[in-house]
């Protein structure tokens, strides 16, 4: 939604002088350039971290604000001693997937950065549908290329859907992106399970009656259907390196540890 700013007095006259000098074609262009210069001077990553810790914004929200990638902002947060709250806080955040699921951008990142991609491929071959908004197609293309360069299977398994992304609004205590809100709306209207590794996005989705689980449900479903994969230790390590929160009891069950 366009933002209107009222400028008058000396500031307005100075802006018009810049136009008169031919430095800008219009006052609007001069204002846009001033705003760009402002953002270039700000430490957007530090401000994004404040949004995350103080305002409880979703990780996607701070990624969008900072202009960083998920990996970039997570690395910055870890360097500041603030691990992201992503993954599953409790076993109830993990379940066996019995039908099609909708992925948010963070979950796409988690899947492709871990061995969940291999599990998702086999589940997809067995009939489980994975949907994602079409706007993440460039992100998926990059992640697939990275996997291919590492010699890993990068066969496509995600089907894209068009979601209606609305304007930026204030959502109260939890700040989520317009895309995240649109995905919650789409999952609710289509009866899909939303896979999100952002605890705050899941909290937002639950408010609207949307079934939502962590991407760790992919591993849970795989183990239920096919048994424990031989590389389960590597799979867990790849998830922890992101770093995803995995409930201890779930990890021990997957590893076959009994107490």
Feature-to-residue mapping (PLM):
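Conserved SAM-binding loop
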Residues: 4, 194-196
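Charged, low-complexity intrinsically disordered terminal regions and linker tails
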Residues: 49, 63-96, 100
């Amino acid at each position: 939604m366009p933002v209107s700013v009222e400028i008058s007095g000396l500031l307005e006259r100075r802006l018009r002088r810049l136009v008169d000098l031919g430095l800008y074609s219009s006052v609007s262009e001069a204002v846009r350039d001033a705003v760009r210069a402002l953002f270039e001077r700000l430490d957007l990553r530090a401000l994004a971290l404040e949004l995350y810790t103080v305002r409880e914004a979703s990780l996607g929200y701070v990624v969008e604000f900072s202009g960083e990638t998920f990996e970039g902002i997570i690395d910055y947060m870890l360097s500041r001693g603030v691990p992201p709250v992503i993954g599953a806080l409790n076993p109830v955040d993990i379940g066996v997937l019995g039908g099609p699921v909708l992925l948010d951008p963070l979950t796409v990142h988690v899947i492709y950065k871990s061995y969940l991609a291999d599990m998702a491929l086999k589940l997809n071959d067995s009939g489980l549908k994975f949907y994602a908004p079409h706007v993440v197609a460039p992100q998926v293309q990059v992640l697939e290329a990275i996997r291919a360069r590492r010699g890993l299977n990068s066969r496509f398994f995600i089907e894209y859907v068009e979601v209606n992304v609305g304007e930026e609004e204030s959502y109260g205590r939890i700040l989520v992106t317009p895309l995240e809100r649109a995905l919650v709306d789409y999952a609710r209207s289509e009866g899909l399970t939303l896979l999100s590794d952002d605890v705050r996005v899941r909290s937002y989705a639950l408010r609207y009656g949307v079934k939502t689980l962590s991407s760790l449900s992919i591993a849970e479903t795989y183990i239920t259907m096919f048994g424990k994969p031989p590389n389960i230790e590597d799979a867990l390590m790849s998830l922890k390196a992101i770093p995803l929160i995995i409930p201890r009891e779930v990890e021990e069950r997957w590893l076959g540890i009994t107490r």
